[in-house]
Regions:
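Macrodomain-like recognition of ADP-ribose-binding/processing modules
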Residues: 1-131
């Protein structure tokens, strides 16, 4: 099944589409984040893609590239879960607004290699599964 990119996902979208999985950005501590991330974290329909250590914009909240293998192992696991769902005919929705809300400049400053890996994996997933 396909992966869709929707500008904004509302809680009603999740509730009214029980067979759809919604991807959101997550952190290792599974705390904070957007209202959508908080809602999806507690939903069977949400799959978080870990991209940081913890919620916040301080440098310590971000993985750094000294932890590249650790960082990418977590991303591989999360993105791999999405790929498995797609191979099993599930529909996945990315909330573009949620992905746009993170601080790209901070990632490029603190963990450029890890961030590049993330962007490449997401781009590949969208290229393969987007209708």
């Amino acid at each position: 099944m396909p992966v869709y990119v929707q500008q904004k996902v509302l809680t009603e979208d999740v509730i009214n589409n029980i067979n759809v999985v919604f991807a959101y950005l997550e952190n290792d501590k599974k705390s904070g984040g957007t209202a959508l991330a908080t809602f999806l974290r507690d939903s069977d329909q949400g799959i978080g893609i870990r991209l940081k250590k913890s919620h916040g914009d301080q440098i310590g909240c971000y993985w750094d590239d000294k932890e590249f293998r650790y960082n990418t192992d977590k991303m591989k696991e999360d993105i791999g879960s999405l790929e498995e769902l797609l191979r099993n005919e599930r529909t996945v929705v990315f909330a573009k607004g949620d992905f746009d809300s993170y601080n790209e400049q901070r990632f490029l400053e603190v963990s450029p290699r890890s961030y590049k890996y993330f962007k490449n994996r997401i781009t590949k997933l969208l290229r393969i599964y987007r209708p």
